[in-house]
């Protein structure tokens, strides 16, 4: 029995020359939790070429969505960036990962801290009704280099608040903090700096991030993961995992897969 489903590409969106997303069909047997990743890829010379990708779509949706960087000499993304509607993609049957609400202790606010394509799992998490049932406020922070790399910005700010089922909760509970490092923008600087200086809390008018009330999910570059882990621990937050819930969780399975 194969470890993969073969899916068909339904749409492709190129955000920039370095960033694209795509949707595929979804086998009815595929089950996952919001925040999970799975192995996806292409068959090259008859063999599967795979990388770990977070699932950006919610687990109740009939299609799958993925967000990817383009690396010209990357074994997979150099090929994946050229996919077109109707092409075949292979998708692993066993999604997994640590960015699940179940791996966090109860809290008042949920911070979702992402850089680059680390946003993908949080697009799934912010479309989960349970997220808003368990936390009073959900704070999505996305750090990129250039404004055009703020994938899903318009969807988050304009479409999600009108969502048929989640719109009211999202309008009242979701706070979005996009930040850019290489261009003038309303929020500038690295995510790590914004956390360290309590810049986010000030801008969103919430208390400084603290162990008593806040829970955190982190997904991004290895440097960002390392720095934020140290900052969380300095503030007294304890890391959780698949066996022991904690105050923050980190996805280490991949760092911008190529």
Language-model-detected regions and their locations in the chain:
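Ferredoxin-reductase
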Residues: 2-85
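Conserved beta-strand elements of the Class I
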Residues: 110-113, 217
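Histidine-anchored nucleotide/phosphate-binding helix
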Residues: 121-133
């Amino acid at each position: 029995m194969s470890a993969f489903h073969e899916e068909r590409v339904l749409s492709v969106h190129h955000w920039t020359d370095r960033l694209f997303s795509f949707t595929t069909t979804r086998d009815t047997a595929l089950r996952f939790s919001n925040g999970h990743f799975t192995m996806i890829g292409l068959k090259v010379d008859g063999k599967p070429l795979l990388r770990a990708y977070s699932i950006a779509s919610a687990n109740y949706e009939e299609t799958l969505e993925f967000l990817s960087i383009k690396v010209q000499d990357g074994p997979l993304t150099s090929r994946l960036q050229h996919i077109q509607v109707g092409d075949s993609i292979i998708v692993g049957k066993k999604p997994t990962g640590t960015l699940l609400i179940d791996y966090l202790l109860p809290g008042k606010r949920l911070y979702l801290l992402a850089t680059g394509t680390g946003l993908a799992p949080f697009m799934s998490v912010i479309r989960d009704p349970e997220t808003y049932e368990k936390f009073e406020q959900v704070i999505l922070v996305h750090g990129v280099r250039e404004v055009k790399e703020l994938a899903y910005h318009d969807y988050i700010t304009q479409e999600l608040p009108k969502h048929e089922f989640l719109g009211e909760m999202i309008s009242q509970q979701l706070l979005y903090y996009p930040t850019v490092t290489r261009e003038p923008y309303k929020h500038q600087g690295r995510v790590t700096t914004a956390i360290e200086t309590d810049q986010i809390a000030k801008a969103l008018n919430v208390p400084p991030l603290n162990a008593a009330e806040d829970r955190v999910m982190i997904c991004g570059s290895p440097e960002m993961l390392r720095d934020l882990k140290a900052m969380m621990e300095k503030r007294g937050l304890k890391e959780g995992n698949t066996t022991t819930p904690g105050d923050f969780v980190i996805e280490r399975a991949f760092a911008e897969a190529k």
